[in-house]
Amino acid sequence: MTDLHDVAGTALMSRPLASILINNYNYARFLDKAIDSALSQNYPTKEIIVVDDGSTDNSREIISRYGDRIIPILKENGGQASAFNAGVARCQGDILCFLDSDDFFHPDKLERVAAAFHQQGMNSRAMLVHHFLAIKSHMDNDLDGDTFGKTHDSPMNLYAFARRYRFLWNEIGPTTSISINRRLADRLFPISERARISADAFIACGASLVGEAYFLKEILGGYRVHGNNNWHGAEQRISQNYSDALQEYLNRKLVENNLAPVISFDDSIYAWPRLVSDRRWSKLAWHMLRLSALQHDRYTARFVYYTLMSIAQLGMKTVKSRTHHLGVMADRFHRW
């Protein structure tokens, strides 16, 4: 296992260009703080690209104030994936760092991420690096000192898991924690523009299949919880269209990288949140029993057990309560 915690002593003989890609839609009240955090990086070789996805507030007025310190891309509204694609197509960096416009970077973010990539060989292979984020309120107050992130052993590649179970968990944190090298960007982009929100999952899951993911055990940015976040809790809002788009994209990328297209969400335990949300209890029970019979392993059996136990405990609660509680149980099971 590779430990990325101690990268402080990693000397950068050169500092490759890092591209900060800020995607924005109607977040004018936070946008200047995101841009300022990018400009304040203590890493000298950087470019800052701000993609405005057809905002109807005063976002573009704010963008214009920064002049040639940033590279603006002003486009019609097409959703988060289209904003990602526009930014990646324009950027020149060997390191690509994504930043949601309602979040911000700490000043040493680029330096630390660049050191992590350098430690692993920069563009020697397709890599993603992610890290913890401090959770903030819309007023920039700490929320009980909590952090946001998903930890795992490094390097992580989930293709063997996906080949067996026909799906994969998203083991990567939200957009603002994600950085990728150019080699991985060339494999993943463009991503499917059917994903108008939560497009970061396409990057995260794609990297977990056709690249390697590394977790850096440091807090290098802030994630704001303000009630309108697209990522926060998005895993509990999996629509059929979204899962179909993600499945098609992942299988296409697998084929492009000479791997078998093994993803089939509806034939896996990935389908359970939607079945719960739609209150399709009989289909959920049949689905879980069928998977348990097909897989014959403790992993699937445990998931079935915790899912059915959770449903039994929910009683007459609302669908919203059902989905949230099952999400907690699934997370506990998954990390067990």
Residue ranges and their predicted role:
Residues T2-I238, A330:
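Nucleotide-sugar donor-binding/catalytic module of glycosyltransferases
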Residues D3-A8, Y165-W169, I197, L209, ...:
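C-terminal subregions of glycosyltransferases and related glycan-biosynthesis enzymes
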